[in-house]
């Protein structure tokens, strides 16, 4: 395990200049936070497996970072980069044009972005045998990173620590959260673990697939014939999962997506009110002339690595960080990450969420109204399957309306919460809730972390 702090006390007015000019400043610099405090490094989590993390200290004008929570953000895919997409496209201090983000979560929490699993973003492996193959391996790697992080950053050991996530990142967050709880109980990791937040998360893949047809039909994006076609392949996915044929289920999942694209004129799986690019539909028609896994990866990781973001990460950001190996590029191993998780992809983790709830860990589920790939109907379906004894009381509650702007009468979300389970329905948002509804996402984060 290797971890060394990378920081340099540079006057803030100088910090943005080299990056905006696309120049190499020479020394590692700490922009763009108000306090100008960032650290980043690699941790060797296994032989030939190196995980990259990037920490921003909170920049609240009224509170010290030690008075605010620490949020770790996990991206989806698997193979999507937290330090890239989550940081510059969703919740970090700057957007992908390097302009300040008004809704950055940094104003209410310190942010820890981790490129996970190994091979994602700036994380990398040396040798094909070092990729993670399943959730257990992903969680084990993260325990090595978190043990190292909290040992070296003792100032965060007592700060409330939350794991926020998106998409497949939610599945990883559940598994990581449970292993972290166990590690804390054993005394091998010292931190103040406060909860997990599962955003549009791949907790029960088959429940998502089964809900696609009814959801699209209710939104006038399928008619009777199309609904029948989608429902037929969804049943095939269910049968494969029930038989434990998870590789086959993953392939059938890809087939279901192709049928949906053909019947909806290329609906966008991440926001049904926006259109997929024409190349997306064209590529889907060619899917089974290539490896179905490679095609699925192109569809579900490509949007997290668009050209502009890739150029930013492999250009100015790489120069800023100064520790990326010369033979590694941001996102260069993403396809291999996705392919190596094939067997694990369609496995549900409802039982893990149950274990978290039974352990008293705060669990928040939040979902965008316009998401298709992990639609709200599917999320509600797996929540109803929880064996948590308090679920009936949770279900009987009436939800409460939320407003991102207290001066507005427009409803931004609904929430239902009982004991250590909460569910947020985020309106007018797709799969990437912070990107679509930044104000409401920030408000939700504050509510989850008990700041409102």
From Swiss-Prot:
The keyword Glycoprotein applies. It holds the Pfam family Peptidase_S10. InterPro entries: AB_hydrolase_fold (IPR029058), Peptidase_S10 (IPR001563), Ser_caboxypep_ser_AS (IPR018202). The active site is at residues 167, 371, 431. It comes from the Eukaryota. Residues 1-26 form the signal peptide. SUPFAM superfamilies: alpha/beta-Hydrolases. It is an enzyme of class 3 (hydrolase). It is found in: Secreted. The keyword NADP does not apply. Glycans are attached at residues 64, 126, 362. May be involved in vascular wall and kidney homeostasis. Belongs to the peptidase S10 family. This is Retinoid-inducible serine carboxypeptidase. The lineage of its organism: Eukaryota, Metazoa, Chordata, Craniata, Vertebrata. The gene is SCPEP1.
């Amino acid at each position: 395990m290797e971890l060394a702090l990378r920081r340099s006390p540079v006057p803030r007015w100088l910090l943005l200049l080299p990056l905006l000019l696309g120049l190499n400043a020479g020394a590692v610099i700490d922009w763009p936070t108000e306090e100008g405090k960032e650290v980043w490094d690699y941790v060797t989590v296994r032989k030939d497996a190196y995980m990259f993390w990037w920490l921003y200290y909170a920049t609240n004008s009224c509170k010290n970072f030690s008075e605010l929570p620490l949020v770790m953000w996990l991206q989806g895919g698997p193979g999507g980069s937290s330090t890239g997409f989550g940081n510059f496209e969703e919740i970090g201090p700057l957007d992908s044009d390097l302009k300040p983000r008004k809704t950055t979560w940094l104003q209410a929490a310190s942010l820890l972005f981790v490129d996970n699993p190994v091979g994602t973003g700036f994380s990398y492996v040396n040798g094909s045998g070092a990729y993670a193959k399943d959730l257990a391996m992903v969680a084990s790697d993260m325990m090595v990173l978190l043990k190292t992080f909290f040992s070296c950053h003792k100032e965060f050991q007592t700060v409330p620590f939350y794991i926020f996530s998106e998409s497949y990142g939610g599945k990883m967050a559940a598994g990581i959260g449970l292993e972290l709880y166990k590690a804390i109980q054993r005394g091998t990791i010292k931190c103040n673990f406060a909860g997990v937040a599962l955003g549009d998360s791949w907790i029960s893949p088959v429940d998502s697939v089964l809900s696609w047809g009814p959801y699209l039909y209710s939104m006038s994006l399928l008619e009777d014939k199309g609904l029948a076609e989608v429902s037929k392949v969804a049943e095939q996915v269910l049968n494969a999962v029930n038989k434990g044929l998870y590789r086959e289920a993953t392939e059938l999942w890809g087939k279901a997506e192709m049928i949906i694209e053909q019947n909806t004129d290329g609906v966008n799986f991440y926001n049904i009110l926006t259109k997929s690019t024409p190349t997306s539909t064209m590529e889907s028609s060619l899917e089974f002339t290539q490896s179905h896994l490679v095609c699925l990866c192109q569809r579900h990781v490509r949007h997290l690595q668009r050209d502009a973001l890739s150029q930013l990460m492999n250009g100015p950001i790489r120069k800023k960080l100064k520790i990326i190996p010369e033979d590694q590029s941001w996102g260069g191993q993403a396809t291999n990450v996705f392919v190596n998780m094939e067997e694990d992809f369609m496995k549900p983790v409802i039982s893990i969420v149950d274990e978290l709830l039974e352990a008293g860990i705060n669990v928040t589920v939040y979902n965008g109204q316009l998401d298709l790939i992990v639609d709200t109907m599917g999320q509600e379906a797996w929540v109803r399957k929880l064996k948590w004894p308090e679920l009936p009381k949770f279900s009987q509650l009436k939800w409460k309306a939320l407003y991102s702007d207290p001066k507005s009468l427009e409803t931004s979300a609904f929430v239902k919460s009982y004991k250590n389970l909460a569910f947020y329905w985020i309106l007018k948002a797709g799969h990437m809730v912070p990107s679509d509804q930044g104000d409401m996402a920030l408000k939700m984060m504050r509510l989850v972390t008990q700041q409102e």
